[in-house]
Amino acid sequence: MRTFDYKKIAEYSWDNEVLSYVAKIHECKGRQELYLKQRPAELERLVEIAKIQSTESSNRIEGIITTNARLKQLVEDKTTPRNRDEMEILGYRNVLNLIHENYAYIPVEPGYILQLHRDLLKYTNLTYRGHFKTTPNEINMTLPSGERHVLFRPLEPYETPGAVEALCCTYQDVLHRELVDPLLLIPCFILDFLCIHPFNDGNGRMSRLLTLLMLYQNGYVVGQYISIEKAIAETKDEYYAALAQADQHWHEEENDPTPFIKYMLAVICSCYQDFE
C-alpha cells in the first residue's frame, strides 16, 4: 500500500523557476485585498463570468458539453437539464457555488469529499455518486490503430478509502504545522488524488474543485474572479504532459511531483496576472 507523507516536501531543494512562481503569487496575494476593496462592482461581474467559464471549461476537458446559450441558462438557474451532459454541468455549477460561498466550512476530509462528489452527480441516476470506486479504473489512451494503451493504473478499490484518509491526514498535519508552503502542498495533494483516482467517474472535475477549495482556504481567491479551470482547459496538453511526468514511479513512491507543481503554479500565476 502506498504511503503519504508530505513532511518530505519540506526537504526538497526547489529550483529558481518554482521559487520565482511562489514569490510572484505571494506578491499578488499581498495586493489582492486592495483590489477587492477598490473594485466591488467590477468584481461582481467577474465572478459571474468566471462561474460560467469554470463550469464550461472543467466539463469540456472531460468531453461534457452543451451550447453556450444552454450553459448560461443552466449556470444562472434559468432552466433544467435536458440530458446527461447538462445534468453533470448543473451538478458542477452547484458544487462550485457551494465552494465559493462556504469554503471556510468544508474541511478537506474523506466524508466531505464524498459529499461533494455526491452533489457533483446529484442530477444523474448514477448509483456510485458519493461513493468511492467499486471497480478498478485504468487511465487509457486509444492509439491511431484503435488499440487501447494503459497510461496509468490507479490504486485498487479496496485500497482507496484508506489512501484518501491518509492523504487528507498528511495534508492537514503539514498545513497546520506550517511545514510546507500551501502553494507547493496543494499540487502534491491533487497529483496524489488523481493517481488514487478514487471514483468511478468525476475524478478530474473533483480534482479541480478541490484545487479551488484548498486555494481559497489558504487565501488565494483569484479563482473566484478569473477561471482557473479555463486556464487549465486552454493548456490541456501541458496539463496531461505534466501529470504523465509526475506520476512516473508513483506506486514505488519514487515519483517527482515537480513537473505538476510547476504547471499548477504557472496556471495560478497567469490567473493572478489576468486579474490585475
At which residue positions do the language-model features occur?
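FIC/Doc superfamily catalytic core
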Residues: 1-276
